[in-house]
A protein has these predicted regions:
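Alpha/propeptide regions of enzymes that mature by internal proteolysis
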Residues: 1-264
Length: 264
């Protein structure tokens, strides 16, 4: 589907320019989705490409439909950071497909809320809960307009793991973390006749700004996926509960406990 789309958008492919090498990532959603049914067809992919825009929904839609994150409903999340380098504004954005982590480890803004959430779900508050080990997959795509070379891009992409760890991910044995970083700076034309090319490149004395931005944006994107996701019942009655519902129930429970204490 991606090859067909690229060919339709660029008649010069394989004639005046190179071939198509699409990049496709994958997350296992078999807990909620009947993956043996192969329900996604080429027309669905082409429709998604046609409707792609700068604004998009987050949570449990598209590739995020069958995702679970920290034992709750996961999905698509995004975030960004603005950077000032030598008086010039730059940006770094993160797009995350969150399908990883265990509930007992979940941490939000430094608060380790996982055990309380797990206790609530195990108490029978909601049906269909099944514990999730720290496994699955997470895909992080980082985009920036800061001019970086391939080594610098690789270094920035590795800082996505710092953001994942802030939410409680310990990168379990069966968890596949994939992070890709690209820069929109230094465009390369396929028909440039010049024998040499001169590109801008960030002085690495400033690269810590990118490292921090990558970690912060990844952390926030994972949390955004969790907060935007809605509860879903999938195949065989498997259910993934939304973080928003769990937090509301925890708040109600703690309010009731506080009232009971005052009455005593």
């Amino acid at each position: 589907a991606l090859c067909r789309h690229a060919l339709s958008q660029n008649p010069g492919i394989c004639l005046t320019t190179g071939t198509v090498n699409p990049v496709v990532f994958e997350c296992n959603d078999s807990y909620l989705n009947d993956i043996r049914g192969l329900h996604i067809k080429e027309e669905h992919v082409l429709s998604a490409l046609k409707n792609a825009s700068q604004t998009f929904e987050e949570g449990s839609l598209g590739a995020g439909r069958g995702m679970r994150c920290h034992g709750l409903k996961g999905g698509i999340g995004s975030s960004s950071r603005m950077l000032d380098i030598a008086g010039h504004p730059y940006a770094l954005g993160a797009l995350v497909l969150a399908n990883h982590g265990s509930l007992s480890d979940l941490t939000i803004a430094g608060r380790h809320i996982g055990p309380r959430a797990e206790e609530l779900l195990n108490s029978g508050w909601a049906s269909g809960y099944e514990q999730q080990q720290d496994k699955g997959s997470v895909i992080v795509v980082l985009a920036t307009d800061v001019p970086l070379d391939s080594i610098q891009l690789r270094r920035v992409s590795r800082r996505a793991v710092a953001g994942l760890s802030r939410t409680g991910s310990n990168i379990g044995h069966s968890s596949g973390e994939i992070a890709l970083c690209f820069s929109t700076a230094n465009p390369i034309t396929h028909d440039d006749p010049a024998p040499f090319r001169q590109n801008l490149q960030l002085n690495e004395a400033h690269i810590d700004l990118l490292f921090r931005a990558a970690a912060e944006a990844t952390e926030e994107a994972v949390l955004s996926a969790l907060f935007h996701a809605r509860s879903l019942t999938g195949r065989d009655g498997h259910r993934a509960h939304a973080l928003s519902e769990v937090l509301a129930a925890l708040e109600e429970k703690e309010t009731q406990q506080a009232q009971d204490q005052r009455m005593i």
